[in-house]
Amino acid sequence: MILGIESSCDDSSVALLDIKNLKLLYHKKISQESEHSPFGGVVPELAARLHTRALPALLEEIKPKFKDIKAIAVTNEPGLSVSLIGGVSMAKALSVALNVPLIAVNHLVGHIYSLFLDCEARFPLGVLLVSGGHTMVLDIDAAGKISLLAGTSDDSFGESFDKVAKMMQLGYPGGAAVQNLAWQCKDKRRFKFTIPFLHDKRLEYSFSGLKNQVRLEIEKIKGQNLAGATDRELSNDDMADICYAFENAACEHIMDKLTKIFKERSFKRFGIVGGASANLNLRSRIERLCLENGCELLLAPLEFCSDNAAMIARAGREKYLKGGFVKHNELNINPRVKF
């Protein structure tokens, strides 16, 4: 079996995967959401401290199975440097203790393999990766080579939801909170936000402008003056109407570029991965797009959309079969590396 370790941001996770039949023998994740929620986002130093507490506890649970581990797959890129260090250090120490090889796994590649947790990978494949840190459309050829078709010039899809939620003091993470409020919208025509790059041929995403539009509307409702004083607070109806308009504009922005890409490329299969892929508005839109283009849609199970060690073990298994091991002194963290 392969041991997978994930600690790229604010989730500590460990998994055991059977190499031959891809059966997930163990998977557990300790989330830090409640600890970071008061701050409206991830506090790196706090995340690092929590990883040093959670990872040893998780590994202690599977200690009786250490003797069956053939390799250790660990996320080493990209992510928060202080978080990555925790997982990589743990993997190195355990690798020495168990005398098993190390496998370095790119976190984003791990998300791709969340589509194939219990089956062999099926390439070629188009992928939309949407998370708190990334927004990109990828093309993966038959050999598994990844090409970037579209990325973001500033905020990511998931990050914009988190920041809008922070403006309304909805806590962290903000994706589910914004989505739930959007469902409560009573006036769907009250707000209409401009969709970024709508008539631009560039295959590029940008969510900072959309986020700023939300901020301006909130300030307008509150009657906020230059000194920061406000006449009133947002009502639940205010927040619901704003969330509805924001979510639809954000999803429409994704779909605008994605539709252009579908016209240029004939995908036989297309997958949605990443924590923000759990957004039901976005999922339903992409389902329609794939149906209209005769394309098979692949979806990761909702519980494995966010960061998890199962996908890291699964991606590591591919490298294991090809002998893709890394020496201890060559396993470094790369916070900003993508592909």
Curated annotation (Swiss-Prot):
Catalytically driven reaction(s): L-threonylcarbamoyladenylate + adenosine(37) in tRNA = N(6)-L-threonylcarbamoyladenosine(37) in tRNA + AMP + H(+)
Its needed co-factors are: Fe(2+)
Keyword check for Cytoplasm, yes or no. yes
Give me any GO biological process, just one.
tRNA threonylcarbamoyladenosine modification
Relay the cofactor remark from the entry. Answer: Binds 1 Fe(2+) ion per subunit.
UniProt keyword annotations, A-Z: Acyltransferase, Cytoplasm, Iron, Metal-binding, Transferase, tRNA processing
Q: Binding residues for Fe cation, per the UniProt record? A: 107, 111, 307
Kindly list the places in or outside the cell where this protein is found, as annotated in its UniProt entry: Cytoplasm
GO CC terms: cytoplasm
Top-level EC class, please? transferase
MF annotations from Gene Ontology: iron ion binding; N(6)-L-threonylcarbamoyladenine synthase activity
Q: Which residues bind substrate?
A: 129-133, 162, 175, 279
Entry EC no(s): 2.3.1.234
Tree of life domain: Bacteria
- Job of this protein: Required for the formation of a threonylcarbamoyl group on adenosine at position 37 (t(6)A37) in tRNAs that read codons beginning with adenine. Is involved in the transfer of the threonylcarbamoyl moiety of threonylcarbamoyl-AMP (TC-AMP) to the N6 group of A37, together with TsaE and TsaB. TsaD likely plays a direct catalytic role in this reaction.
The record's family statement is: Belongs to the KAE1 / TsaD family.
Protein name per UniProt: tRNA N6-adenosine threonylcarbamoyltransferase
Give the source species: Campylobacter curvus (strain 525.92)
